[in-house]
Amino acid sequence: MTRRVLLHVGAPKTGTSFVQDILFTHRATLLERGILYPADRHDAHFLAALDLMELPWGGLEREAGGAWDRLVDEVRAWPGTAIISHEILGTASRVQVARALESLGANEDTEIHIVYSARDLVRQIPAEWQENVKHRRAKEYGQFLDDLRDEQRSSQVAQWFWGVQEVPDVLDRWAESIPRDRVHLVTVPPPGSNPTLLWERFAALFGIDAQEFAPTDKANASLGVPESAMVRRLNERLNDVLPNHQYRTLVREMLVHRNLSGRPGSPRLSLPEDAYRWASDLGRSCVSELALRGYDVVGDLDDLVPGPAVPFADPDEYDEREVSEAAIDALAIMTNESARLRDAEAELRGEIKDLTAELERFRGTRTYRGKERLVAMSHTNPVARVGLAIYRRLRGKSSRST
């Protein structure tokens, strides 16, 4: 059987996390079907990507050492189809791409396929700024848009965005040595499409039954404009005082993902008129270029042509009353969480108190005092040392704590 690797390299905000959730959740069943998704933890492919590209990432890179090689070892030991998926791979340099492909056996008997999922820029740009905000960035939306439109792309924001979102460039780097029929471009359907259509496209490409592995959870809802403005300002207050691991737990997961996303009545973020025209022109140019390349398109290139403009609400100058309402909701959420944690802490303190009292009662027994004396004597008395050894053999390893 020919070893086959499907290498999904992005882009962010195109259903990648959603697909990875399905693959990770069903990895045991997929293995029975002959498809390997090699992961012992949900972020295994993320850590492997960090390792491959030697990216700093809030301290997580320290966990990533050797992760790429471990992933590759699993893939190369598997005789059938394997899937690797993480969106940050899209920004890999040509040198890093060459290392990745060579390590996976591209020059040997491995059939490597490059998978890239794309969405129109008019939706991608606002989504990327919101993702920045959720990762504790505090840059205003207007400045973010200016950075992206800078022809020099001198800012870190622009370099990252275009590194993972400029479709022709990403595929130039990843697919230069790959036959065109093994380069698969999955397009994200336009708004209003069947919500399962994107998954059906991925499933068809991966060779699995979309119905058997149908997602049960709804996709993550986006932050609205006032919520985005509020979280950005919150970042300004927290960035110098709150460690990354606490921000991930309290702000990104608990506050944003579980509570503020999808808050009713909030307008969704879009582009101002001039940025919309610019992004639309870029999108059409991109589609024209991709149409000439002969890649396998899973979907329709027209999906990458932006739809009509929607009304723009500026998060940098939004109605302060609405932002304040979002802030009050956030305060209520945090207060409830603080109360829950205090109750849990009080319960744990009570359990510790009970266990401490039980331990003290045990230490007061004649048996325990006798064992303590025997242990103390064994340091200087050979007979006591032999007696302790015999006692431990009779009682087993559990007595070694004495």
Residue ranges and their predicted role:
Residues M1-T402:
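Anion-recognition interface
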